[in-house]
């Protein structure tokens, strides 16, 4: 089971792909209008390994939320508690470079509490397409296999990849 903010983009606008394609249960958690998730609400939704319930394995957070930068201290605290409860923590950071510019925090500071982070190169950076999954080697290896199984590969994409590299090297501050 995945715990996720009820109004987060991944929960609302991705056609429940995790459930449909991955067989993963989704447990939406209420968030404030600014996207903040209450720690107690998150803790109360974590299920133990009981045959009556889906086992909670992942907390998915989002920064930014509807253009609003989430307080880093809140995200870090949610991740810390989730890790203590043996959950992995993923950050949907599609527009994380916007949070980087707004807060002045380094990308390392914005991401160090998470096991994996997804970043979009076309949202705010000007690349025509492309996303990054940032994680340890074990997670990346699993992601490569899943991408292959789902047909998510492209061939001869050097030109497109070079646009993403250019965006990372030149467009963050703009």
Predicted region positions:
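Conserved PLP-enzyme active-site core in the AAT-like
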Residues: 1-174
């Amino acid at each position: 089971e995945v715990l996720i903010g009820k109004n987060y983009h991944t929960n609302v606008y991705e056609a429940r792909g995790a459930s449909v394609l991955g067989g993963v249960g989704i447990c939406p958690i209420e968030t404030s209008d600014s996207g903040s998730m209450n720690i107690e609400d998150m803790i109360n939704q974590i299920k133990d390994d009981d045959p009556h319930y889906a086992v909670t394995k992942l907390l998915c957070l989002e920064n930014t939320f509807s253009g609003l930068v989430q307080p880093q201290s809140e995200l870090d605290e949610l991740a810390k508690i989730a890790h203590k409860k043996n959950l992995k923590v993923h950050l949907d950071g599609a527009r994380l470079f916007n949070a980087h510019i707004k807060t002045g925090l380094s990308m390392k500071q914005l991401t160090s509490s998470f096991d994996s982070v997804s970043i979009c190169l076309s949202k705010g950076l000007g690349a025509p397409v492309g996303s990054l999954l940032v994680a340890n080697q074990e997670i990346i290896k699993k992601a490569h296999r899943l991408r292959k199984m789902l047909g998510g590969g492209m061939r001869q994409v050097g030109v497109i990849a070079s646009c993403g590299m250019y965006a990372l090297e030149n467009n963050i501050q703009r």
